[in-house]
């Protein structure tokens, strides 16, 4: 535990900037030396050092690193692999921080509001930590945001922009401007726990008809913009669950429940939970899914969802004109025939399990490196034709698909993904999704500015 990180001061912010600048500038300098001076860089060694440096930093940079590790070739392979290893359960902050945070948010005598309060965090992540407590004789979870995260976001994202800009000079395959903008907006939203409380209500509304998912309920009188109190959900994390050696039937059931938990909101309401990180869900004894952490969600335009479905149909039918239309709906601009053919290679990998009407694993080859190797080939082809600029929407959509694919591979699930998918899209219309999305946003009190984003 560490209390020394309670630094809501100018000095603390300067130390933060200095630490992040040192870490990211070191990466930038090494990449520049490799590209412009012919200096041979031991990427594996330096990537490991980078992970260790970022792992010691609480806050958004660690979250950004986890996201970047799932975007094909946003960073060199060696760095992506090391950043993927960043753990959500970083060391928690101690009782001094907890007392200060709770008092500043709930006032003097905050302890009297609870029947009991566990001083030790039960989990810690990049932006905050969670404590167990009892309220009105019910078990609750309380998420406390780490200090000075708003300043940390500005420091981290400014330094990330430096690395992105330099990497683009070295490698022109991917333009990262919109990726940076998307990460910035989503991270700002994650710091607003009142917004997350509304997101939680949104998911409770959208998944009310799904019997195989359990969602916490926010407790408004014990929540602010920096602490979020919610009902407790009980379950096992994925890796612990797999240690129990569940049957193939049970693993398949968990996979189906996960698929519906993620994609019913998307295909019915145009909303995605963009963070299928191992710490954000657990598995009940009855195989239901506990979904947690609602900071990283995105509301899409209905025609974007239509574009996702149209791209599936284009790949299925070999319809190039429909593919052009679909990529346009995604937000890709100025793609020529060759660029679309290259993107279709990656799309074919992502959509592959949905295109085959049979029971199969999510990836026929169990080797988890296959997707990255394929992405590498796509990357080289994109670089050859001058590169593309992925739209903002791509970031969380791709992260969800790749992250869920990893979950299904861990489960070794064998499911008819085609039928699961068609069960959600066969009656799809833009008008019906727009109506459901509007009603859901209004029902929970989220800003209507989200509509049509």
Regions found by a protein language model. Give the residues of each.
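N-terminal accessory/targeting segments that precede structured cores
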Residues: 1-129, 136, 154-176, 381, ...
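Helix-rich C-lobe and terminal helical cap/extension of kinase-like folds
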Residues: 5-14, 38-48, 71, 224, ...
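Short, amphipathic alpha-helical segments that act as regulatory/interfacial helices
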Residues: 25, 58-62, 161-164, 201-204, ...
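A short, charged helix-loop
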Residues: 32, 142, 373-376
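ATP-dependent phospho-/nucleotidyl transfer catalytic cores
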Residues: 77, 84-91, 103, 150-158, ...
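Glycine-rich ATP phosphate-binding loop
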Residues: 132, 138-146
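Conserved beta3 strand of the Hanks-type protein kinase catalytic N-lobe
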Residues: 133-134, 276
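Hydrophobic residue at the +6 position relative to the catalytic HRD Asp in the kinase catalytic loop
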Residues: 279-283
């Amino acid at each position: 535990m560490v209390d020394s990180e309670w630094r809501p001061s100018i000095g603390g912010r300067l130390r933060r900037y200095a630490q992040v600048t040192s870490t990211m500038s070191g990466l930038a300098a090494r990449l520049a030396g490799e590209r412009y001076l012919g200096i041979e860089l031991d990427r594996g060694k330096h990537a490991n050092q980078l992970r260790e440096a970022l792992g010691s930093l609480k806050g958004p940079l660690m979250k950004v690193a986890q996201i970047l590790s799932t975007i094909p070739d946003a960073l060199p392979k060696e760095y992506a692999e090391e950043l993927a290893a960043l753990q959500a359960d970083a060391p928690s902050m101690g009782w001094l921080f907890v007392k200060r945070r709770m008092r500043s948010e709930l006032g003097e005598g905050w302890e009297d509001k609870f029947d009991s309060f566990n001083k030790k965090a039960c989990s810690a992540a990049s932006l905050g930590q969670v404590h167990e407590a009892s309220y009105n004789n019910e078990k609750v979870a309380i998420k406390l945001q780490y200090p000075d995260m708003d300043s940390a976001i500005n420091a981290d994202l400014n330094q990330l922009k430096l690395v992105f800009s330099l990497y683009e000079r070295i490698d022109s395959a991917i333009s990262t401007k919109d990726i940076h903008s998307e990460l910035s907006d989503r991270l700002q939203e994650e710091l607003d726990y009142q917004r997350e409380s509304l997101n939680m209500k949104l998911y409770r509304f959208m998944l009310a008809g799904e019997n195989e998912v359990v969602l916490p309920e926010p407790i408004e009188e014990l929540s602010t913009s920096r602490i979020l109190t919610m009902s407790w959900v009980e379950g096992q994390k994925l890796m612990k669950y797999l240690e129990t050696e569940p049957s193939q039937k049970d693993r398949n059931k968990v996979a189906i429940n996960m698929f519906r938990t993620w994609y019913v909101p998307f295909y019915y309401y145009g909303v995605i939970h963009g963070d299928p990180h191992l710490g954000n869900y657990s598995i009940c004894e009855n195989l239901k899914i506990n979904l947690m952490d609602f900071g990283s969600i995105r509301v899409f335009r209905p025609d974007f969802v239509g574009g996702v479905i149209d791209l599936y149909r284009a790949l299925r039918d070999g319809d190039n004109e429909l593919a052009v239309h679909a990529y346009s709906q995604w937000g890709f601009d100025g793609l020529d025939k060759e660029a679309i053919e290259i993107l279709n290679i990656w799309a074919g990998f992502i959509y592959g399990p949905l295109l085959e009407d049979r029971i199969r694993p999510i990836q026929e080859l169990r080797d988890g490196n296959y997707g990255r190797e394929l992405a590498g080939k796509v990357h080289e082809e994109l670089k050859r034709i001058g590169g593309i600029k992925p739209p903002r929407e791509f970031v969380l959509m791709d992260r969800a698909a790749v992250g869920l694919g990893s979950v299904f591979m861990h489960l070794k699930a064998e499911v008819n993904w085609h039928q699961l998918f068609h069960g959600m899209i066969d009656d799809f219309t833009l008008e019906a999704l727009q109506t459901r999305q509007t009603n859901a946003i209004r029902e929970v009190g989220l800003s209507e500015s989200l509509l049509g984003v």
